[in-house]
Amino acid sequence: MALVPMRLLLDHAAENGYGIPAFNVNNMEQIISIMQAADETDSPVILQASRGARSYAGENFLRHLVLGAVETYPHIPIAMHQDHGNSPATCYSAIRNGFTSVMMDGSLEADAKTPASFEYNVNVTAEVVKVAHSVGASVEGELGCLGSLETGQGEAEDGHGFEGKLDHSQLLTDPEEAVEFVNKTQVDALAVAIGTSHGAYKFTRKPTGEVLAISRIEEIHRLLPNTHLVMHGSSSVPQEWIDMINEFGGAIPETYGVPVEEIQKGIKSGVRKVNIDTDNRLAITAAFREAAAKDPKNFDPRHFLKPSIKYMKQVCADRYQQFWTAGNASKIKQLTLDDYAAKYAKGELTATSRTSVAV
């Protein structure tokens, strides 16, 4: 089989009440880790790459690594997603390079630093949706800026993230605006701002409702029951990996991520895609440091890379179980981009809100 549209996976997740972790990839070892975990847990897969990852790996290398996963695991439905596309051009180049899903992040302007107006966000996102849907590709939009409700600041990821401080009105997705945004853009998925941010340093204490607004997801889901919601910046930052890194020479200070139980609450309220990167980075770093410390004379790269696959695979398998993804890959009938282009053309996948239906 070929890669599948992300919409196919999100629809199945919604129908069956589970979420799908979307793991960022940059190299072969990360893809192997994810696919081994998915194979062992019978889980559908969303691989995603940022602009930085595409630049780091190179378009051709990245594309063939992903196709290698498809050929090796033909029984697992896999979507390849562009994370945080900063402009329509970025999204179109991703589709040309084989991505079956793109994120048009119009919450920021094309410089990926300046918070954008609602009108700008709607216009660029709707433009991408029109083009992507014509070829069957899925589109994720974002409303609100990702950042900390504690500090008002965000953490740039591969150069993508606002600068300075924002107030809560910009850091929390407005439910009524979300309805208007979905109706005007027809996105397949909506990333919501609830106080999470990129990187390891998300919260200075275990998050509560004051700094992690899971209740905002519930409000949005009530108005948009048929829209697939997305949580960004949702690594849990497990203490075990931080302890291991620091045991073997690291210096990561105390920090807190998004507790798994909070993500599970989100999944029960319409979250279908959960973005995770930092947890895997921590596991890989722990493996490298441990391997180097225990055998300092070894200079074979495989000595460091093999344990990194093992540890990252552990993280991925845990998330597939915790998000109730496990056991669902074999239940999904794989469809193509052409199949979905036909569905969009016929209006079968038109987004509706509770408000618009009532009218």
Swiss-Prot record:
Entry-linked PROSITE patterns: ALDOLASE_CLASS_II_1 (PS00602), ALDOLASE_CLASS_II_2 (PS00806)
Residues reported to bind Zn(2+) 1: 84, 198, 232
Entries under InterPro entries matching the protein: Aldolase_TIM (IPR013785), Class_II_FBP_aldolase (IPR050246), FBA_II (IPR000771), Fruct_bisP_Calv (IPR006412)
Keyword hit for Iron-sulfur: no
Amino acids binding Zn(2+) 2: 105, 142
Keywords, sorted A to Z: Glycolysis, Lyase, Metal-binding, Zinc
Active site per database record: 83
Top-rank EC class of the record's enzyme: lyase
Residues the record lists as binding D-glyceraldehyde 3-phosphate: 50
Coiled-coil spans in chain: none
Family: Belongs to the class II fructose-bisphosphate aldolase family.
NCBIfam families in the record: cbbA (TIGR00167), FruBisAldo_II_B (TIGR01521)
Protein name, per record: Fructose-bisphosphate aldolase class 2
Organism: Synechocystis sp. (strain ATCC 27184 / PCC 6803 / Kazusa)
